[in-house]
Amino acid sequence: MRTAQITRKTAETDISVEINLDGTGTYDNLTGVGFFDHMLDQLARHALMDMTVRCAGDLHIDDHHSVEDVGIALGQALTQAMGDKRGIRRYGECVLPMDDARVACALDLSGRPFLVWDVEMPTAKIGTFDTELVREFFQAFATHGGITLHLTQAAGVNSHHIAEAAFKATARALRDALEVDPRTADAIPSTKGSL
C-alpha cells in the first residue's frame, strides 16, 4: 500500500495528514476553513486518494498559514507515499468543465517542482475565503510534492466554479499519473533510472 502520515507543527499551525494513494476517495478533512475543506474533499474524491487532514491554525490572523501549510504537508505526504515512484504512469492531464468554468491541468511527478498558474478569479473572496490562497495552496503542494504542475483556465466567470475546476482537474490528472502501469510495474518511469 502506498500510504503516508505526516505531522507538521509550527508556531502558526499544527497539522496532521494521512493519505492512501490506492484508496477509493474517502475523506475526512477539517482545517477550520470551510471552503478549503470542500476543495480538499474534491481533491481526495476525484484522485481516488483516501485523505484525512486535521489543521489547527492561527485563523484569528487569516486563513493563509493554514492553507499554505496544509499544501506543504500534503505535498510531503504525497512524496513519502510515492516512494521511488516505481511503476507509476508519471504524467497526467485533464480538462475539466464546471458550469461556466473550464480549467486544464497537466502534471509530471518528476521530482522537479514548478507551478505554471494561468488562472484568474474575478472576485477577491469566495464567501470569507481569499481567492489568492488557491494559488498559494498549489504552489506549496507542487513544491513539496515534487510536481511540475500547469493549471490553465480557458473559461469562467464564477470564482467558486473556477477554483473547484482547478482542484478537480488536478485530482483527475493525479489519479492518472499515480496509477501503476502493469507493463512497467517494476520500472522507474525515466531513462535516468530515478525520479
From Swiss-Prot:
Assigned EC number: 4.2.1.19
Domain of life where this protein originates: Bacteria
Keywords annotated in UniProt: Amino-acid biosynthesis, Cytoplasm, Histidine biosynthesis, Lyase
Main location: cytoplasm
Annotated S-S bridges: none
Any one cellular-component term (Gene Ontology): cytoplasm
Pathway(s) per entry: Amino-acid biosynthesis; L-histidine biosynthesis; L-histidine from 5-phospho-alpha-D-ribose 1-diphosphate: step 6/9
Name of the molecule in the record: Imidazoleglycerol-phosphate dehydratase
